[in-house]
Amino acid sequence: MDKHTICLLNDSFPPIIDGVANAVVNYAENIEKHHGHAVVVTPAVPGADDSGFPFPVVRYPSIDTRRLVGYVAGYPFSPETALRVREEKVELLHTHCPIASAILARSLREVVDAPLVLTYHTKYDIDIAKAVKSRLLQESAIRALVQNVNACDEVWVVSRGAGENLRSLGYEGAYTVMENGVDVPRGRVSAAAVAAATVGYDLPDGVPLFLFVGRLMWYKGLHIILDALRALREQGQDFRMVFIGAGGDEKEVRAEVETLRLSDRCFFTGSIADRETLRAWYSRADLFLFPSTFDTNGLVVREAAASGCPSVLIVGSCAAEGVTDGRNGFLIEENAVSLCAKLTALCADREAMRRVGENAMRELYLSWEDAVARANERYAVVLDRYRSGKYPKHERFSDEFFNTQGDLMEAMSRVAEMRGETGRLRRELREGFDEAREALREKLEKEW
């Protein structure tokens, strides 16, 4: 298969880490290693060092809002960025975010003459609802998001559930399910590695160990876990529960553990960045508890499966796609009673947990190498369709575009001093694009 130069865009990238940033890193590394050349375009972050990456990282101007929201707000018009991408001879643009990165990708498309693919990773309507209380602003932001999605030549989603969420926002076009992979190898770690990673925790042999890995946010189903564990203890069942991760609700979660008198059986490790240490915890656990309906692509479920740890999931959730109850995972209803009943049955059948874990390792695991190979095959289809003129022409930016995108960036910024300034943001979007377009035209004219 021919090798191509792919430009990957996202609003977050190391040193800012989240699931989508991790996906972009793995896309870029595997494209560079196996399929051609990758270029990453992302907002500038003070102090970021990109020298260790085996591919170029192009940073565009941003506002540092990490202290308030944990992210930088990218300013998506930059003639320097456009010229740099043009110099890389980019053949396809792939944005992993429908906000600033999508706006930038839409403007770059005019410069590099390349098709634009978007991957929809997460339920942005929930993020928008958390960011702003104004119903009108929420609706305007969602319209802008859908506008960006509609402007792409091809839309990918990480799961069927992600596609359904996108449909619920008003998107009516086609989409392709393109699953993400995991960056851990298949197989359990050694007993010595498990002992080293878990030293200091009260984890008796023969006592079931349950595990949660992810952001400590209530919407991840943590109330269901804690209420089920309380009921399990009241039944006289011994167990241990380990929470790995951090998050905005961590203090409340810890307090609830104390209130429910579970602190002698529930432990918090904080975030664990080392992948081998994380593999050791997956290898030690009997069950991975993930009763979340928020996540569009439960990569942690596949991480657990890589180490032979079966998951307990909500029936019909995105994380449960591909899971058959009692075969390669366990399914419950979205309530603590159902989870407690499942845990009670499984604590009495440790062999079932082991057997289902082995099946999960064989059937659910997907490496990033295989995931990006699938994406690369689809890139070839997109390029062929684009070069054959099979994609419709897209409209140039309009006044409505600048108005709605101002609302979207306002909503997603979640920065107090930027609230109520949609007019300024709209003007800056309009002025920024006009200035960038003129500057780019001047530079291109000089080159030609």
Can you describe what each PLM-predicted range is?
Residues 254-272:
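Nucleotide-activated donor-binding/catalytic signature segment of Leloir-type glycosyltransferases, i.e.
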Residues 293:
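Aromatic "clamp/platform" in nucleotide-sugar-dependent glycosyltransferases that forms part
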Residues 22, 208-231, 237, 241, ...:
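A conserved mid-protein helix/loop that constitutes part of the nucleotide-sugar donor-binding site
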Residues 310-314:
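Short hydrophobic beta-strand element within catalytic cores of glycosyltransferases
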